[in-house]
Design a protein with these regions (language model features):
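Membrane-embedded, hydrophobic transmembrane alpha-helices
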Residues: 1-107, 463-467, 471-474, 554, ...
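Aromatic/acidic, Gly/Pro-rich catalytic loop(s) in extracytoplasmic/lumenal soluble domains
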Residues: 755-802
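Membrane-interface transmembrane helices that cradle and orient dolichyl/undecaprenyl
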Residues: 220, 261-277, 311
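Transmembrane-helix signature of polytopic, membrane-embedded enzymes
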Residues: 38-46, 196-198, 214-237, 270, ...
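Membrane-lumen/periplasm interface segments of specific transmembrane helices
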Residues: 307, 311, 330-379, 414-480, ...
Length: 802
């Protein structure tokens, strides 16, 4: 890549990032005037929340107008930036210079233990940035339906889920009606680079928001600054939390915006700030548009604030109806209400207009039409051995398309073996209703407290996925009754009641969230190791548990030395565990291991030695990747220890910073910019190398052997994103595969001018599909292999012979 091109793309990216900042600053300054308890973390929360809201609104407006392209986005960002600067100038004409902006300062200087906590968390954040910038994702769901959505938006400049032939772009029925608010941020990050570099950057923003919100809520519920920082750090360094940043999963953003909205609602309840109420309403709308199950969280927040306001009106006799009402509605509140309706209703209104959902059943949607029409089955060419249909007297009904896998990863299947005995047709049992199956997929429906194996499976997944940070949080929070007994002051107050209710509510919402059992709800009383992968649905509960732990630690005055030690160990152990999880996932992705992480964890129950040996075998070639971060971390801790020992109060450092002249600050800023430019350059180069290794060179093959906008058909693949190419400029068409309609399927390929098809790795399917694929890819079949070797374990490409 030419340095000029790289610098130009980086400048465009920075324009997109900086655009909404003045508008967010104007909101933060307005809030500063209304809230007497304003603090620097509160300022950062308002700034980042306002930035996220503005960016998503820009993306939704442009995407709905079919203008989600780089030029339109840059113009919109510049316009938003100008509006923000005008608002700041109009409200602060006398102090418009940057040096006079009212950015709040820390009320008390940071002590060494707090600096250590901040430093450990910042180190984890740096590692996350390095990971998302240098390593492409191998996450199952991200490659299956999250990233293909973003790629298609990038190609069409609009929010479409259809390919060029009018078919769905992925084989996930439910994903067609998901809301995608947070994905809009990722789509904006794709535009300047024309590839998925920094596509996961919004996940890092969500990670930061999560930490700030947990800290502020801890303070709100009575914790001191030190314990609030510790709680936030422990939540952020949970291995499962770290492992979600380099994905496009909406669960971390959901937890982050939920805790943000909870804090803003409680802050408004005490400060009566209209800007905070505006942000609260807009955040609630954003939550509703992040995920379908988030509708319950959004409704809970609105209902909770309504209850608090009604209680305030009833209990306080001096609180007259005039004071209860907002006398003068400011424009900022009107904007918040409009954002709530727009962000919360956009995707659901779109679904109602485009595909008649949820009014109609998504399985009965006939628009767009599938390419294979429903005439009577046409028998396909017979493979050499055995025939594609069993030699039974009764006719066999047409074989349906294979169902999409259960959400979450599944282990690749081994190569198909020829059946020993053909199955006898049976009358299928009536399937359960969709709503019943959804309920049966929840942990509440499947978990049997009297079943020891259920406790073992769930406990082992929690222990290995969440590790020391969760154990420390849970242990401290569980000592709350002790604080109630020993407390000399009144413990049962409104704040503690609110915290208890919200904690219990988020716990209940987790266990009744679909797929928390790891199963699809086909039967009752079953748990799957996939429940460990789906622990991410419980992030809101984990956040509230950390807040409760901070409040409890404050009441019990838990020793700070112990807390600091736990935080420092949790930070590096979380980083190492996250790296291990990635290496195991990558080994399964590339076919070097056939065991997925959740199944490997479950194997520790009965085959401990075998599981340990398998982990060592996977990690053996990657020991340097595991050792580099601990070495840097220990080195930084030693440096900090020497610095604190020589100057505990850091007066010398403060005096040095105070003595710097304006020119020195400018020089430091220039050096930081130069480091950022060079670091991102190196990161992109490293990402290209890692992508070629993990994706096995499929991007390189597509770039060299196909032309932009060439059509590539795919079927039976949960990695369809790989077929778009590095620059996302290949037309990827979904071609539903029917083993009993091979001639019609081939005609459909020719009709759509598809000369190359991709599929694999394969999941569970019927024997006839396996036999049909074996014939298609045989020397006598119509497909010629051009990339990949084993479609059972990797994505492969074939060209049509005729």
């Amino acid at each position: 890549m030419l340095i000029a091109q790289y610098l130009w793309e980086l400048i465009l990216f920075l324009i997109i990032i900086v655009g909404p900042i003045p508008l967010s600053l104007s909101l933060a300054f307005e809030n500063h005037k209304e809230n007497s308890n304003y603090s620097f973390p509160h300022f950062l929360l308002v700034l980042l929340t306002g930035w996220s809201l503005a960016q998503i609104c820009i993306g939704l407006i442009l995407g709905s107008a079919d203008r989600l392209n780089l030029a339109a986005v840059i113009i919109a960002e510049m316009l938003i930036c100008a509006i923000g600067l005008i608002l700041i100038y109009a409200k602060n004409q006398k102090s418009f210079s940057f040096s006079q902006w009212q950015i709040p300062q820390l009320k008390q200087p940071l002590i060494p233990s707090e600096l250590l906590i901040i430093g450990a968390t910042a180190f984890a954040g740096f590692v996350l940035w390095e990971t998302l910038a240098t390593k492409p994702t191998t996450n199952y769901d991200s490659l299956w339906f999250h990233l293909p959505v973003i790629a298609r938006w990038y190609q069409t400049h609009s929010f479409t889920f259809l390919d060029a032939a009018g078919n769905w772009i992925f084989e996930h029925e439910q994903a067609r009606v998901y809301p995608y608010n947070w994905h809009v941020l990722s789509a904006l990050c794709v535009l300047p680079f024309k590839e998925d570099f920094l596509t996961a950057f919004p996940m890092l923003i969500a990670w930061v928001l999560e930490g700030i919100a947990v800290y502020l809520l801890s303070i709100k519920f009575g914790a001191t600054r030190f314990y609030g920082m510790a709680a936030a750090s422990l939540v952020l360094t949970v291995p499962m939390m770290l492992n979600q940043v380099n994905t496009i999963h909406p669960d971390l953003p959901l937890a982050a915006i939920f805790t943000v909205a909870l804090y803003l609602g409680l802050s408004y309840h005490s400060s009566r700030s209209q800007s905070e109420l505006s942000l609260f309403l807009a955040s609630v709308g954003m939550i509703a548009g992040i995920k379908i199950t988030a509708l319950v969280y959004a409704a809970s927040l609105l209902g909770g604030l309504a209850i608090l306001e009604i209680k305030r009106f009833i209990v306080n006799k001096n609180f007259t109806p005039t004071n209860f009402r907002i006398r003068h509605i400011k424009p900022v509140l009107v904007c918040g209400i409009l954002c709530c309706l727009f962000l919360g209703g956009f995707w659901y209104a779109r679904n109602l207009l485009h595909i008649n959902y949820p009014v109609g059943d998504s399985r009965e949607i006939n628009i767009p039409l599938q390419p294979v029409a429903p005439p009577s089955p046409v028998p396909g060419p017979k493979p050499p051995v055995p025939g594609p249909k069993p030699p039974v007297a009764s006719p066999k009904p047409p074989v349906a398309s294979p169902k999409p896998p259960v959400p979450g990863p599944k282990p690749p299947v081994a190569s198909p073996k020829p059946p020993v005995q053909q199955p006898t047709p049976t009358i299928p049992a009536p399937s359960a209703s969709p709503l019943l199956k959804i309920w049966q997929s929840t942990l509440a429906a499947q978990f049997n407290p009297s079943n020891i194996s259920h406790w073992q499976m769930f406990g082992l997944q929690v222990l290995i996925r969440l590790q020391l940070p969760f154990l420390a949080i849970a242990l401290q929070a569980s000592s709350a009754p002790l604080a109630l007994i020993q407390g000399k002051t009144r413990i049962i107050n409104q704040n503690n009641i609110i915290l208890t209710v919200v904690l219990a509510s988020t716990g209940i919402l987790y266990v009744i969230t679909p797929y928390t059992s790891g199963t699809a709800g086909e039967a009752i009383g079953q748990l799957s190791p996939l429940l460990g992968f789906n622990l991410r649905y419980g992030f809101p509960f984990l956040s509230l548990l950390a807040i409760a732990a901070a409040a409890t630690a404050t009441e019990l005055k838990t020793r700070k030395q112990v807390i600091v030690a736990v935080v420092l160990i949790s930070s590096i152990s979380g980083i190492i565990s996250n790296t291990i999880f990635d290496l195991i996932k990558n080994a399964s992705f590339t076919g070097k291991s056939i065991v997925w992480g959740s199944w490997l964890i479950d194997r520790f129950k009965s085959h401990f030695a075998e599981a340990i040996n398998l982990v060592i075998k996977i990690l053996a070639p990657r020991w340097p990747d595991l050792g580099i971060y601990p070495l840097i971390y220990v080195g930084l801790l030693l440096l900090a220890g020497i610095l604190f020992k020589r100057n505990p109060s850091l007066i010398g450092l403060k005096n040095l910073l105070a003595s710097l002249k304006k020119s020195s600050y400018i020089m430091i800023i220039c050096v930081c910019i130069a480091l950022m430019v060079s670091a991102t350059w190196v990161a992109r180069e490293k990402r290209d190398v890692a992508r070629a290794e993990l994706y096995r060179g499929i991007y390189e093959y597509i770039d060299k052997n196909t032309v932009p906008n060439e059509k590539i058909g795919f079927f039976l693949s949960y990695r369809s994103y790989l077929f778009y190419g590095k620059n996302l400029d290949r037309q990827v068409l979904y071609v539903p595969f029917r083993a009993d309609r091979l001639p019609a399927w081939m005609d459909n390929l020719h009709k759509n001018n598809i000369k190359m098809v991709g599929f694999g790795p394969l999941t569970e399917m019927d024997e006839y599909t396996k036999l049909a694929l074996s014939w298609l890819t045989s020397p006598e079949g119509p497909l010629q292999p051009v990339f990949g070797k084993d479609f059972n374990t990797e994505s492969v490409l074939y060209r049509l012979k005729y």
